[in-house]
UniProtKB/Swiss-Prot annotation:
Stated name of the protein: Transcriptional regulator MraZ
Keyword Repeat: yes
SUPFAM superfamilies: AbrB/MazE/MraZ-like
Organism of origin: Aromatoleum aromaticum (strain DSM 19018 / LMG 30748 / EbN1) (Azoarcus sp. (strain EbN1))
A Gene Ontology cellular-component term: nucleoid
Length: 147
């Protein structure tokens, strides 16, 4: 289970060092991880075993609706399988870095079964948007949580 928000830095080659405490769960037995684009201009980072059922469900959706086709192209079309190097770093494809507007400072944000990877500016904008929602009613499903 991935949780927490961690500020990290990309190196000059576009590599991200995955925190040691998450490596075994993210790449069990050296399996690749999957990185893909998200419509909110961040990246999704999944263990391969968690991504495959999602990919299969997406691929099985009919492509007649233009929105469905667009999401399939985004989520499956951008998906990259990558391994970690000996230093625990993953190379982020240039197309993915460009999509999410990633520069040096990034945020790795746990979402349970996967991570989101945000640019610093994108993450700060998300935080501001979240604070703006605090006066609104809770989203469906959250009402019963005792927080």
């Amino acid at each position: 289970m991935f949780q927490g928000a961690i500020a990290l830095s990309l190196d000059a080659k576009g590599r991200l060092a995955i925190p040691a405490r998450h490596r075994d769960a993210l790449v069990p037995d050296g399996a690749p991880l999957v990185i893909t684009a998200h419509p909110h201009k961040c990246l999704l980072v999944y263990p391969l075993s968690a991504w495959e059922p999602i990919r299969d469900r997406i691929a099985a959706m009919p492509g007649f609706d233009p929105r469905t086709s667009a999401f399939k192209r985004l989520l499956v079309g951008f998906a990259q399988e990558e391994g970690l190097d000996a230093a625990g770093r993953v190379l982020l494809a240039g197309s993915l870095r460009q999509w999410a507007q990633l520069e040096k400072q990034v945020w790795l944000v746990g979402q349970g079964a996967h991570f989101e990877l945000w640019s610093d500016a994108g993450w700060q904008a998300q935080q501001e948007a979240m604070l703006a929602l605090t006066g609104d009613a809770l989203p469906p499903g959250f009402e019963s949580l005792a927080l």
